UniProtKB/Swiss-Prot annotation:
Gene Ontology cellular component terms for the protein in this record: nucleolus
Gene (name only): NOG2
Location within or outside the cell: Nucleus, Nucleolus
Keywords assigned: GTP-binding, Nucleotide-binding, Nucleus, Ribosome biogenesis
Listed name of the protein: Nucleolar GTP-binding protein 2
Family in the record: Belongs to the TRAFAC class YlqF/YawG GTPase family. NOG2 subfamily.
Region (Disordered), start-end ranges: 1-27, 144-164, 461-500, 541-693
Biased composition regions of type Basic residues, renumbered to the chain: 661-677
Binding site for GTP: 308-315, 352-356
GO molecular function terms listed in the Swiss-Prot or TrEMBL record: GTP binding
Residue ranges of every copy of the CP-type G domain listed in the record: 198-359
Note: The C.neoformans mating-type locus is unique, spans >100 kb, and contains more than 20 genes. MAT-encoded products include homologs of regulators of sexual development in other fungi, pheromone and pheromone receptors, divergent components of a MAP kinase cascade, and other proteins with no obvious function in mating.
Length: 693
């Protein structure tokens, strides 16, 4: 036991003695503790004493337990018992039947196929079951290959079942679609495939919650990084993918509408034109990003990464959203070297990424050059890429752009490329010694115009009739290949019909996909390049009519919801509309005559007032009635005009007809304020003005 308050101090004669500073002990007793201090045991010392003394039973003289120790059971408590059998004690805590699991798997697949549904919480869901195949299905091996023919003495050697035929056509097709390349490839064609750039890409993918894939509207499928999209869907399924169709001002509006409709089945797609002063799609993209930030309300901010091919306009889109130059921009590829963080709003950050090029066996050196991956000035022989360019561009556009003479059938092959480059070099004055045309310099000029959009070109949307030479289809020169292509036309039609059916079926299952609250008037896009009549046409088909009907239905639904909420507001709005419809709107000519008559009456009244200035008598009743009527008419007209002027609805106008873009409208003289008269009309100048002052 510890020492209490009243223990014997005589047993310890040195108790209470304190050493002095010199080290000698004095006989005087001094108090160790300050008066008022608690000298009882604290909690720590009390628990230690309890640990030492506890754990033992209290017994009497005979050894019988009087008080049991802690955690000690008596004989009565230790009687044998029996637990009632129940599955809840011995079964699994989380179980699911196979039918429920199959239902979950099918529902999960349908939701995964829908790019417009977002899974907010996934911590307690068995997401691995969605990727597994159904284990109930047994492999039908015995039906395809019997056991006796596979194993045993009657086993047969397996050979591929091929149709017997000649391999000439197959070899020609292989040369067309997969041309042989030299083993030693120039390093300039490997731009965008280095480990450093792909390291920057994976930094952006890991850091971003929303990934925006920027596509070129002239060739969306050609500028899509398919391996990156598949990687995001398999490994990063929780990240959102959005397609942005940039450079829509370089293609007709019907092409943009088709591509948006086609790409919207796989991911939300937005048409965009990057320009700080005159952009298209900026509000729609910001609205979409705000919706994603609302979905991730548990996070302080979200990051949006921009990926895509070089020279597709990733940095230009960021500058457009910020409305100022925050990223370096150039019309040549490879300007962005490293990733860059930009703050768009308090909760939305943007990440700029350098352009990447996926390694694909189908892309040749010419394809990489025509996609704008390589800088043209660094090419050693740019003239070798011109024949492929001539196959993709209509001859009329080259004639119009460079002022060439018309040739029936256009130019094909190396001979046509030589003729075109020679004519362009002579016209532009690019000559070598002796007056020979510099074809390489002319080829660089044509390729630069091609990349910057001065030469009109676009790839026709899939599953639709192609527009002549604009479609990205390689035309053959030999007769054998032409015959082979004619045979394949029927197969291509069948595949197109199959694709159309798949697209329609997918559209029926998923519905017409569009993000609610994000609408784009694609018909109002101002195209910079002028296309010919058959290229600038716009198809009106059943599908587009269905889209318009769906838009009307969505608008009607929104109106119904608004009606339920604000009935009084709409009634007042209807009254305002009825008031706005005035006599001037219905009969403008008669209204003009009435206004003129009113003006004459007002002038007469003014003259009468000027004549009667000296006589300040009360005017007659007729004059009062006239003035009141005129004043009331003027008040009504001013009220109507005020309503029209204060409305926030602006009429659509073309930006390039009003603004002085590149000094095109510098000769046009428009006064700053036509309503006001000039200073010379109001005040006299010269000596007369000085005299009056």
């Amino acid at each position: 036991m510890g020492k209490g308050k009243n223990h014997d101090r005589k047993a310890n004669p040195g108790f209470g003695k304190v050493k002095s500073k010199t080290g000698t002990s004095t006989g005087e007793f001094t108090l160790k503790r300050v008066k008022g201090e608690n000298f009882y045991r604290d909690a720590k010392s009390a628990s230690r004493v309890k640990m030492l003394n506890g754990g033992k039973a209290v017994r009497d003289r005979d050894g019988k337990i009087v008080e049991a120790a802690a955690f000690q059971k008596g004989e009565k408590e230790a009687e044998p018992g029996r637990v009632k059998p129940d599955r809840r004690w011995f079964g699994n805590t989380r179980v699911i039947s196979q039918s429920a699991l199959d239902h979950f798997r099918t529902a999960l697949k349908e939701q995964k196929a829908d790019p417009y549904s977002v899974l907010l919480k996934r911590n307690k869901l068995p997401m691995g079951f969605g990727s597994r195949k159904n284990r109930k299905q047994r492999p039908h091996i015995v039906e395809t290959e019997p056991f006796g023919n596979t194993f045993g003495p009657k086993a047969q050697r397996k050979r591929p079942r091929l149709d017997i035929g000649k391999g000439n056509g197959t070899a020609d097709l292989a040369d067309i679609y997969h041309p042989t390349t030299s083993t030693a490839r120039e390093p300039i064609y490997a731009k965008g495939t280095s480990r450093r750039i792909w390291g920057e890409l994976y930094k952006v993918l890991d850091s971003s919650d929303v990934v925006i894939h920027v596509l070129d509207a002239r060739d969306p499928l050609g500028t899509r990084c398919k391996p990156v999209v598949e990687y995001l869907r398999k490994e990063k399924a929780h990240k959102h993918l959005v397609y942005v169709l940039n450079k829509v001002d370089l293609v007709p509006t019907w092409v943009t509408a088709r591509w948006v409709k086609h790409l919207s089945l796989s991911a939300p797609t937005i048409a965009f034109h990057a320009s700080i002063n005159n952009s298209f799609g900026k509000g729609s993209l910001i609205q979409l990003l705000r919706q994603f930030s609302v979905l991730h309300s548990d996070k302080k901010q979200i990051s949006v990464g921009f990926i895509g091919y070089p020279n597709t306009g990733k940095s230009s889109i960021i500058n457009t959203l910020k409305k100022k130059k925050v990223c370096t921009v150039a019309p040549i590829p490879g300007e962005t070297k490293v990733w860059q963080y930009i703050t768009l709003m308090r909760r939305i950050y943007l990440i700029d990424c350098p352009g990447i090029v996926p390694v694909s066996a189908k892309d040749s050196d010419t394809d990489t050059v025509l996609k704008g991956v390589v800088r043209v000035e660094n090419l050693a022989t740019p003239a070798e890429h011109i024949p492929a360019l001539l196959e993709r561009v209509r001859p009329e556009y080259l004639e119009r752009t460079y002022g060439l003479e018309h040739v029936e059938g256009g130019w094909h092959g190396e001979e046509g490329a030589t003729f075109v480059l020679t004519a362009i070099a002579k016209k532009s004055g690019k000559l070598l010694k002796g007056g020979e045309p510099d074809q390489e310099a002319a080829a660089k000029m044509v390729l630069n115009d091609w990349i910057r959009g001065k030469v009109p070109f676009f790839v026709a949307p899939p599953t639709k009739p192609e527009s002549g030479a604009d479609a990205h289809v390689s035309s053959a020169t030999t007769e054998k290949v032409q015959e082979q292509e004619q045979k394949e036309l029927a197969e291509e039609k069948e595949t197109k019909e199959m694709l159309e059916e798949q697209e329609r079926s997918l559209g029926k299952v998923l519905g017409i996909k569009r993000v609610k609250g994000v609408e784009q008037p694609i018909s109002k896009i101002v195209t910079m390049t002028k296309f010919l009549g058959d290229d600038a046409r716009r198809y009106v088909e059943e599908e587009e009519v269905d889209v318009d009907d769906v838009d009307k239905e969505m608008a009607e639904e929104d109106e119904d919801e608004d009606e339920d909420d604000d009935d009084d507001v709409e009634e007042s709005g209807e009254d305002q509309e009825e008031e706005e419809l005035a006599w001037d709107d219905v009969f403008p000519e008669e209204a003009a005559g009435v206004d003129a008559a009113d003006g004459e009456e007002v002038e007469e009244d003014d003259e009468e007032e000027e004549g009667d200035e000296d006589d300040e008598d009360v005017p007659s009743a007729k004059q009062l009635g006239k003035r009141k009527a005129i004043d009331s008419d003027e008040e009504e007209q001013t009220a109507i005009k005020a309503k029209r002027m204060t409305t926030n609805k602006q009429k659509a106008s073309n930006f390039y007809t009003h603004a002085n873009v590149k000094n095109r409208n510098r000769d046009r003289k428009v006064p700053k304020n036509p309503g006001k008269r000039s200073r010379g009309d109001d005040e006299p100048t010269g000596k007369k003005a000085k005299k009056r002052r």
